[in-house]
Structures are given as C-alpha cells and as structure tokens.
Amino acid sequence: MSTQKQKLNKLAIFLIPIGIAVNVVGGQLAVLLKLPVFLDSIGTFVVGALCGWGPGLLVGLGCGLINAISLPTLLPYTVIGMLFGVLANLMAKKGMFSAVWKAPLNGIMIGIISTCIAVPITATLYGGFVGTGASVIVTTLMAAGWDVVPATFVSELTSELTDKIICLIIIFFVLKAMPARFVVKLPNGKYFIKED
C-alpha cells in the first residue's frame, strides 16, 4: 500500500511542472497578444482536480511566480491561482466536472470569486491598470467618466467570466480525454471514473 501511495505521489509531483508549463504558456500568450482574458489557470484546475489541493496550489504558486518575472504586476494575483488549485479539488469531489453543461456554470462561479479578489488588488495597487488586455476596458470606462473601482470591477468581471468559462470548458474536455488507466492512478482519479 505504501509503495502504491508513493507512486501516486510521484505521479502527482510529475504533473505539477506540466501544469505550470500549461499555465505559463497560456498566460504569456494572452499577455503578448493583449487578449482581454488570462488563459493561465487551465493547468492549475486540471492538476488540482486530479491530484488534490496541494499539487493544485503549487501549480498556482509556480505559475504566479514565473509569470511575475516578465510582468511583475501579476505577482499579487498569485493568491488567486493558488485558490484555484484548492477549488479544483473541491469541485472534483462534488462532481462539478462530470458534464459539459456544468463547465459554463463553474466558469461563472469561479469568475465571480476571482473578480471579488482581483478588484481590490487591481484598484488599490495599480489604479485599475495592470498591463494586460483587461486594462483597455478600464481605460475606456474611465475615459467615459467612471471611477476607478467600478471601472475595474466591470473590466475584471468581463475578463474573468470570459476567461473562466472558456478555461473550464477546455478543462472539461481535457479531463474527459484522459485515459481511465491513467486517471485512476491519481489521488482524485476515483471522482472521474464511472462505474459500469
């Protein structure tokens, strides 16, 4: 039993850098293209859902630290990525990745949670401007006479909802595409294997 548990831990540890790489590539692509979405949480959710909150949290932390190298303003948002790893674990245990129709609902829920955390960071530390594509929305709204907090809220909510709905649909299909013989070896694999 302990040998099997060590293998599970080794497999989960193996997936952490893969999750970080997926996040970093998605996040950097969104920043470079100035997209109004982030695309930097897919790896966190997949690893958190399959391997548990600890590996998911580490993926969120690693991604946040690496992304902050090229765009230091992203560092305070690392806490949100870490929270995603924990939430992915809870969502897996509650069967929230079991049907495609749940993905947009999950995206809305996660988008609202992340907006509530991101708005105070963005408005307080950066005056609404982080240097991502979402800053375009803030600029437009502030030019129209909006104050920084409501403009930041609308910008964050728009970006987060769009991003998280897209990401959670992708995550659903990634999880469904994984072979059962692989998934069953992971700590949360039992939540993704259907009994016949």
Identify the residue ranges that each predicted region occupies.
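A short hydrophobic/aromatic micro-motif that marks alpha-helical segments and, especially, helix-coil
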Residues: 55, 66-69, 177-179
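A generic short alpha-helical patch detector that favors 3-5-residue windows
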Residues: 13, 17, 79, 145-146
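Short glycine/serine/threonine-biased micro-segments
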Residues: 25, 46, 50, 54, ...
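Membrane-embedded alpha-helical hairpins and interfacial helices in multi-pass inner-membrane proteins
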Residues: 32-34, 74-76, 97-196
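Hydrophobic transmembrane alpha-helices
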Residues: 1-50, 54-65, 85-93, 171, 175
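Interfacial aromatic-anchored transmembrane helix boundaries in multi-pass membrane proteins
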Residues: 24-39, 61-102
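Alpha-helical transmembrane segments of multipass membrane proteins
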Residues: 22-27, 59, 63, 67, ...
